[in-house]
């Protein structure tokens, strides 16, 4: 008989952070943890088909199994390409 596990689900914005603790059955997935957290209803900007997810800063898939004590993280999409930003900074410093 599977037991219960406790998992945290985190989502951070520049102005506010969300951290929800949920209790799930052993063998639950990342997606089940996110859905159980209620964050999808609270934040309509989260789209699991677009937002990447991870467990303790390591990339994960929605189908990955979570373990007791895990922190599932929902990442916001990048608003700018990091390579492009570095190129722009390099050009700016070269022009000084």
Swiss-Prot record:
The keyword Repeat does not apply. Disruption phenotype: Deletion of the pasT-pasI operon causes reduced infection of the mouse kidney but not of the bladder. On rich medium operon deletion decreases bacterial persistence about 100-fold. Forms small colonies on rich medium. Delays growth on minimal medium supplemented with threonine, increased sensitivity to oxidative and nitrosative stress. Growth defects are complemented by low levels of PasT expression. Keywords: Toxin-antitoxin system. Pfam families: Ub-RnfH. Disulfide bonds: none annotated. It comes from the Bacteria. Belongs to the UPF0125 (RnfH) family. Antitoxin component of a type II toxin-antitoxin (TA) system. Unlike the case in E.coli K12 high level expression of this protein abrogates the toxic effects due to overexpression of the cognate toxin PasT. This is Persistence and stress-resistance antitoxin PasI. The lineage of its organism: Bacteria, Pseudomonadati, Pseudomonadota, Gammaproteobacteria, Enterobacterales. The gene is pasI.
């Amino acid at each position: 008989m599977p037991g219960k596990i406790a998992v945290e689900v985190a989502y951070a914005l520049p102005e506010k952070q969300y951290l929800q603790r949920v209790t799930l059955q052993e063998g639950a997935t990342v997606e089940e943890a996110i859905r159980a957290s209620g964050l999808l209803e609270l934040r309509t900007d989260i789209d699991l088909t677009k937002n990447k997810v991870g467990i303790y800063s390591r990339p994960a898939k929605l189908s990955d199994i979570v373990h007791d004590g895990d922190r599932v993280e929902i990442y916001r999409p990048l608003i700018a390409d990091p390579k492009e930003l570095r190129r722009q900074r390099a050009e700016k410093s070269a022009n000084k």
